UniProtKB/Swiss-Prot annotation:
Family: Belongs to the YihI family.
Coiled coil regions, renumbered to chain: none
TM segment ranges: none
Phylogenetic classification of the source organism: Bacteria, Pseudomonadati, Pseudomonadota, Gammaproteobacteria, Enterobacterales
Matching InterPro entries: YihI (IPR007336)
GO terms under biological process: ribosome biogenesis
Naturally occurring in which organism (per UniProt): Erwinia tasmaniensis (strain DSM 17950 / CFBP 7177 / CIP 109463 / NCPPB 4357 / Et1/99)
Protein name: Der GTPase-activating protein YihI
Function field: A GTPase-activating protein (GAP) that modifies Der/EngA GTPase function. May play a role in ribosome biogenesis.
Amino acid sequence: MKQPARTSQVKKPAARVKRKTREEINQEARDRKREKKHSGHASGSRANPATVSQKGDKSQSVKDPRIGSKKAIALGTDAPVRQPANPVKAAKPAVEKKPRLTPEEELAKLENDERLDALLDRLENGEALSAEDQAWLDQSLDRIDVLMEQLGIALDDDAEDEKAEEDMYRLLKGSHRTPE
């Protein structure tokens, strides 16, 4: 098969662009440099800012862009105390902070807790506890263990003390026999 001839492939000569001379290129570069030099703010623009007129706020004084205040502050003790324009409202105590209990007080409080006693009695009687009650009971018992450990109290502390005293007494007496 023969390919059809394409007539659109023939390129037409484009219009020639006139090349700039070296003098024209240099002049354009100088113009760009001159414009670039004057692109910043005018001298003194920070100290004397241009005022932008606003339609609604004509009564408002011009605000100083610099940080700080120009108001005089009385340094003497006889200066009158000024109240702020918007007095600060006292914050409402949403939740009063409970006074922090010492470990001894917290342990005594937990040992005298009626709910804890009732739940322990129910467990001793073989009753099943709800998941919520069981979780609270476990948490309370864990806290009691932590407090007792902090205070150096052990459950069988008394029996060990008596045994240790007997051993010390026998060592001091010179009797090396072991107790029966």
